[in-house]
Amino acid sequence: AQTVILTSHIRPDGDSIGSTLGLMHYLREQGKDARVLIDDEIPRIFRILPGIEQIERPAEGTRYTADLLIVCDVELKRTGAVLDAVDAVRVLNIDHHVTNDEAAEYLYLNPDYAATCEIMHDLVHAMGGSFSLDAATCFYTGMATDTGFFRFSNTTPHTMRAAADLIEIGVKPNIISVAMEMKSYDEVMAQV
């Protein structure tokens, strides 16, 4: 596939944004025409992620074409308007949620992983690929947020090894942690 559109769920989180952006960076490094469409606002805490400004929201009435639509971190029906707006030759769904309805034409589903970004890490390695710092930063962010910064019970030795691999590339966990834990004034006041 030469043209690839990546998407994820409405109400995007670290794993959905990290997996789509990280894979976008990787695919572009392989010479592919890759873009990210997400049918929702992107939370401000993710503004530190490389390429965040390139995430597009599908424009009403606009048709998008691609050789491949990759739906990350969610089943197809939770992508908002994206699924209806994209004409793709093939649809691939990559997810770690056991609740996935398995409706995609092609599905890579593995609930043993803590995050879709952890799956992406292994898929890139399985293809013999390597990570740029931009892709590694995005994938690390998704793994960190879906594991509560490696505190939740879904954190496995494999998760930690994958995170360590990304840190060796140059990811700065402290910068990501501080950015993800920042709260807006309204969020702080809501807790008072």
Q: Predicted regions span which residues?
A:
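Generic beta-sheet signal
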Residues: 37-39, 72, 94-96, 111, ...
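A structured phosphate/pyrophosphate-recognition subdomain
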Residues: 1-10, 22-28, 102-192
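Short glycine/serine/threonine/alanine-rich loop segments
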Residues: 32, 89, 129
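Anionic-ligand anchoring segments at beta-strand to alpha-helix junctions in alpha/beta enzyme folds, i.e.
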Residues: 4-65
